[in-house]
Amino acid sequence: MSQNEPKIPQATAKRLPLYYRFIQSLHASGKQRVSSAELSEAVKVDSATIRRDFSYFGALGKKGYGYNVQYLLDFFRKTLNQDEITNVALVGVGHLGTAFVNYNFLKNNNTHIVVGFDADETKVGTTMSGVPIHHVDEMEQIMKQNKIDVAILTVPSAYAQSVADDLVRFGIKGILNFTPARLTVPDTVRVHHIDLSIELQSLIYFMQHYPTAEGVHQ
């Protein structure tokens, strides 16, 4: 985010890619304008929250008219840096890592896994879905060559912190952590933790204690 752009709440920032994906779909279908109520129904975020999120960026729409789809598309493409390619490294090419390589964020035009790393000699030197797999000992050199500053971590939890330490040392600025380990990194490095077992347990708890959901979607 540049100095000229507003600093928005983190919760709002996490919803922006969701809005952008739906707006892309609207644009592809030929729709020219959309109301906050229509957006709310599609993305399962209440209208008041959508209007508040959009208000951080100024007047994106007009009362009684809604939002111009083309304008929103252009605005969010610029805000989310969709014209700037982000190269991503995958560290840990096990079952989950292999799934990421095969998927490779096909719906995201600006995000691609360009290299994978693993300690398994049977995987090193192979190519999976067009992504070359290298030994973890080669991370520093290859990451610098490819100007990578984002990594997905899917290694065994016992190795997560030491691998994260290496990633930080190699200049990584963002880590998407799929291991159960809670990583310690400098303030200059952003980590998002995604623990699938915790998410599943949380889902089951909410099913049991909040069965009607009341319009709340996580």
Swiss-Prot record:
A GO BP entry: response to redox state
Cellular localisation: Cytoplasm
Alphabetical keyword list: Cytoplasm, DNA-binding, NAD, Repressor, Transcription, Transcription regulation
Pfam families attached to this UniProt entry: CoA_binding (PF02629), Put_DNA-bind_N (PF06971)
Positions annotated to bind NAD(+): G92, V93, G94, H95, L96, G97
Main subcellular localisation: cytoplasm
Entry's Gene Ontology molecular function annotations: DNA binding; DNA-binding transcription factor activity
UniProt KW Flavoprotein keyword: no
DNA-binding region residue numbers: 18-57
Keyword Iron-sulfur: no
One Gene Ontology cellular component: cytoplasm
Assembly and binders: Homodimer.
Family: Belongs to the transcriptional regulatory Rex family.
General function of this protein: Modulates transcription in response to changes in cellular NADH/NAD(+) redox state.
Name assigned to this protein: Redox-sensing transcriptional repressor Rex
Origin species: Exiguobacterium sp. (strain ATCC BAA-1283 / AT1b)
Upper taxonomic lineage: Bacteria, Bacillati, Bacillota, Bacilli, Bacillales
Gene coding for it: rex
